[in-house]
Curated annotation (Swiss-Prot):
Keyword rRNA-binding set for record: yes
Any GO CC annotation of this UniProt entry: small ribosomal subunit
Entry-linked HAMAP family: Ribosomal_uS7_B
GO biological process terms on file: translation
Organism: Pseudomonas putida (strain ATCC 47054 / DSM 6125 / CFBP 8728 / NCIMB 11950 / KT2440)
CDD domains named in the record: uS7_Bacteria
Record key words, sorted: Ribonucleoprotein, Ribosomal protein, RNA-binding, rRNA-binding, tRNA-binding
The family this protein is said to belong to: Belongs to the universal ribosomal protein uS7 family.
Name of the protein in its database record: Small ribosomal subunit protein uS7
Keyword Disulfide bond included in the entry's annotation: no
InterPro entries: Ribosomal_uS7 (IPR000235), Ribosomal_uS7_bac/org-type (IPR005717), Ribosomal_uS7_CS (IPR020606), Ribosomal_uS7_dom (IPR023798), Ribosomal_uS7_dom_sf (IPR036823)
Function in brief: One of the primary rRNA binding proteins, it binds directly to 16S rRNA where it nucleates assembly of the head domain of the 30S subunit. Is located at the subunit interface close to the decoding center, probably blocks exit of the E-site tRNA.
One Pfam family, short name: Ribosomal_S7
Length: 156
C-alpha cells in the first residue's frame, strides 16, 4: 500500500457512439496492447450484431447482461491460526462491474465463433437471457460463498 496518499480515480470519458461511460470502461477491458481502435471496432460490431438479432436497444441488452453476470458476494482467503478459510464477503459496486466485464470478455474469448465481435455478441445475448459461461461463473462464485457461510464471522 502506498505510504503517501491514495491516487485519485481518473475520469473515463463517455464512448463516442452511445455516450455511455460503462461502455467506455468495457472497451478498456476488451482492449489489448493499447489498441483502442480495434477494441472499439469489436465492441461496436458486437452491439450491431446484438441489435440485428434482437431488434432492440443494444445498450439495454448490454446492461442487462452485466447485471446478470455481476456477483453480489465472493470469497476471500483469510488465515486464522494454521488454517486458511474462504470467507464470504460482499462485493462493492465498482468491483462488481469490473468483475462482470472481466468475466464477460474472458468467456467471450473462449467461445468458438469466428470473430471476437461475434463471440462477444453471443456471450452478451446468452448473459442477458441468464445463461452462458459468464453467468455460470457468477453462480459458481455464489455457490462457493454459500458453502462457506459458516466462516462469515471472520470478517475483514
Amino acid at each position: 500500500m502506498p505510504r503517501r496518499r491514495v491516487a485519485a480515480k481518473r475520469e473515463i470519458l463517455d464512448d463516442p457512439k452511445y455516450g455511455s461511460q460503462i461502455l467506455a470502461k468495457f472497451m478498456n477491458h476488451v482492449m489489448e496492447s493499447g489498441k483502442k481502435a480495434v477494441a472499439e471496432r469489436i465492441v461496436y460490431g458486437a452491439l450491431d450484431t446484438v441489435k440485428a438479432r434482437k431488434n432492440s436497444d443494444p445498450l439495454e441488452i448490454f446492461e442487462k447482461a452485466l447485471d446478470a453476470i455481476a456477483p453480489l458476494v465472493e470469497v476471500k482467503s483469510r488465515r486464522v491460526g494454521g488454517a486458511t478459510y474462504q470467507v464470504p464477503v460482499e462485493v462493492r459496486p465498482s468491483r462488481r462491474n469490473a468483475l462482470a466485464m472481466r468475466w464477460l470478455v474472458d468467456y467471450a474469448r473462449k467461445r468458438g465463433e469466428k470473430s471476437m465481435a461475434l463471440r462477444l455478441a453471443g456471450e452478451l445475448l446468452d448473459a442477458a437471457e441468464g445463461k452462458g459461461a459468464a453467468v455460470k461463473k457468477r453462480e459458481d462464485v455464489h455457490r462457493m460463498a454459500e458453502a462457506n457461510k459458516a466462516f462469515s464471522h471472520y470478517r475483514f
